[in-house]
Design a protein with these regions (language model features):
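A mobile, often basic/glycine-rich helix-loop segment
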Residues: 60-86
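ATP-dependent adenylation/nucleotidyltransferase module used to activate substrates
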Residues: 1-19, 31-53, 146, 222, ...
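Short catalytic/ligand-binding loop motif for oxyanion handling, primarily in non-cytosolic enzymes
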Residues: 13-14, 58-62, 67, 154, ...
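Short, basic, helix/turn surface patches
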Residues: 28-40, 79-85, 197, 260-265
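Adenosyl-5′-phosphate
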Residues: 45, 49, 86-306
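A conserved beta-strand->alpha-helix junction
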Residues: 1-24, 106-124
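Acceptor-substrate binding/catalytic loop of class I
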Residues: 27-29, 208-209
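Short low-complexity, flexible loop/linker segments enriched in glycine and/or proline
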Residues: 19-23, 65-68, 245-247
């Protein structure tokens, strides 16, 4: 038997949480993590040790719409370009030099594409089958994205005097997952490979959005223990509607933090370029929620550690 607790977060909760969150994380983070902060706050009222599901997605293919984008390319370098383009979406490539103008001389030789590529230096990079592309993506996310999640998980739980344990990252289970065939993780790979690339919108609509594909082996294992609606459910992220908050309830908060004349942000970033990108979101033209959250987080860190 389990007991379930519900906490409803509003835009103001994000605003109030930001100083404490930035302090405990000790460094700027791109991913929003205030829902995690409030979940830890609630759990700490009842327990001192919690179990986390971190690692389940990265080991068993929980983000198929990401992997499928780069699954039918010609070679390793093409694969890197395609997969990198998905991850490097915080700032448009055409705007990077403008945004970092105040410190451009210091960062112009830092090529994130090369850093991205170097993750695979110790990995076998022969890409002969669609499964090879998928395994490359899973390897990359386990080596990078997962590490960031674990940092947040650990620091936020410790800020509430709790310990988080991650059963999916048990050594034996990780070894098993790394050897597990792709067809036990993803159901739609065969269809993705065969789809007509010239079919208008077909691939994007079917496979680049959230579906009930992914983590198939976990779904099969648990089908006798949890409701069918969960076994066949779509991937549900642990996030809040900040995209709408930033241009709605929190619009004044965003403008006050990012558009004021005293923020230390613009010792490092170009004001006009940043404001242009932020306004694209506030005007409803482009979803730049991750960019705005990154700016808010960085701005708060500047105040804490200046």
């Amino acid at each position: 038997k389990t007991e379930h607790y519900e906490m409803v977060l509003k835009a103001g909760d994000m605003e109030r949480c930001l100083p404490k969150l930035a302090y405990h994380l000790e460094e700027p983070r791109v991913g929003q993590s205030y829902p995690n902060y409030y979940a830890a706050q609630l759990a700490s009222k009842f327990v001192k040790v919690v179990l986390s599901g971190a690692g389940g997605d990265e080991l068993f293919g929980g983000y198929p719409w990401r992997y499928y984008r780069a699954v039918v390319n010609n070679d390793f370098e093409h694969y890197v370009d395609k997969y990198y383009s998905f991850w490097q979406r915080l700032i448009p490539n055409t705007e990077i030099k403008n945004v970092f103008a105040p410190i451009w001389d210091d960062v112009k030789d830092v090529w994130t594409r090369d850093i991205f590529r170097d993750i695979f230096l110790t990995h076998k990079n022969e890409l002969n089958t669609p499964e090879d592309y998928i395994n490359h993506s899973l390897y990359f996310e386990a080596k990078t994205f997962l590490h960031g999640l674990l940092v947040v998980e650990d620091k936020i739980s410790m800020s509430h005097s709790m310990e988080t344990r991650v059963p999916f990252l048990d050594n034996d289970l990780v070894d098993f997952a790394m050897k597990c065939p792709v067809n036990l993780k993803l159901n739609n790979l065969t269809d993705v490979v065969r789809i007509n690339e010239n079919e208008t919108g077909g691939k994007k609509k079917k496979y680049f959005q959230k579906t009930n594909d992914g983590k198939q082996i976990l779904r099969n294992v648990m089908k006798n223990y949890v409701p069918n609606s969960i076994v066949k459910g779509q991937k549900q992220g642990f996030s809040s509607p900040d995209a709408s908050w930033f241009k709605g309830e929190s619009i004044d908060f965003v403008k006050t933090k990012l558009f004021n004349g005293h923020t230390p942000l613009y010792d490092y970033l170009d004001r006009d370029s940043v404001e242009k990108l932020v306004n694209q979101h506030l005007d409803g033209d482009v979803n730049r929620r991750l960019f705005i959250w990154s700016l808010l987080n960085f701005e708060e860190c500047c105040h804490i550690y200046e």
